[in-house]
Curated annotation (Swiss-Prot):
Recorded GO MF terms: ATP binding; GTP binding
Keyword ATP-binding set for record: yes
A Pfam cross-reference name: RapZ-like_N
Keywords recorded for this protein, A-Z: ATP-binding, GTP-binding, Nucleotide-binding
SUPFAM superfamilies listed in its UniProt record: P-loop containing nucleoside triphosphate hydrolases (SSF52540)
Official protein name in the record: Nucleotide-binding protein Bcep18194_A6125
Positions of GTP binding: 57-60
Record-listed ATP binding positions: 8-15
Free-text function comment from the UniProt entry: Displays ATPase and GTPase activities.
HAMAP family in UniProt: RapZ_like
Amino acid sequence: MRIVLITGISGSGKSVALNALEDAGYYCVDNLPPHVLPELARYLAGEGQHRLAVAIDARSSASLDEMPGLIRDLSREHDVRVLFLNASTQALIQRFSETRRRHPLSGSLSHDADVGLLSSLEEAIERERHLVAPLAEFGHQIDTSTLRANALRTWVKRFIEQKNNDLMVMFESFGFKRGVPLDADLMFDVRALPNPYYDHELRPLTGLDQPVIAFLDALPIVHQMIDDIHAFLMKWLPHFRDDNRSYLTVAIGCTGGQHRSVFIAETLAARLAHEANVIVRHRDAPVDVDASSRLVSEVDRP
């Protein structure tokens, strides 16, 4: 059975992800107590169900300590994938404010004044981060701070399309001026490279457009940067595998996340597609949803 566990911070998009999996044919359960999961998996398998998605959050805090062992045990019999959704505190506060929902851990905190509400919400978010932090190492982390709901649904679809039993590498381009990704395992700064932004004809384009590709591809220093990052990854990917890592997020950052980081993330993703399951995501580039997050397929490989 394929089991997808969705966990992370409240307000980061777990309901959106669960709905996307339901649309993909998964049997979905929200806020299932972790200790019930093995029994549910056995029951559904006996009923002929082959796909299960479960959302688990801090409302199950009394059982969260059991999760690492449960994940290991379930992985012996099932294809288990863990998706850990995260977002910045600022983004989470804005979402709770817009939806007027109360954080699930804020019930015992003061809500008497506006300042008290903000303080209580921040405290609840930080408390939840501490509670669910041990689960992050088992899952692929995705920072949804700047991700729209339709983009997250598309990303979840890409996530479940990956092949099993191998390391999944996500190359994520971003702009430093919008903050660093919360989900990065490795981060490379490519701001030292020539910037197409200063060419007025290239400024409105992205690293996916042919004129920008031609500009960067003609520069030896760009290829040196790509070769160095590629060599580092080729050397250390086996060690990540040996450490039983299932997921690795490699963040590539330039100033705005539109030109250089996009081109380099795409190039590295194509190169590494021979070595691992690869997803590429462009966090800040003004591209459509399908281009901003996709699984690198055979046709992308050089």
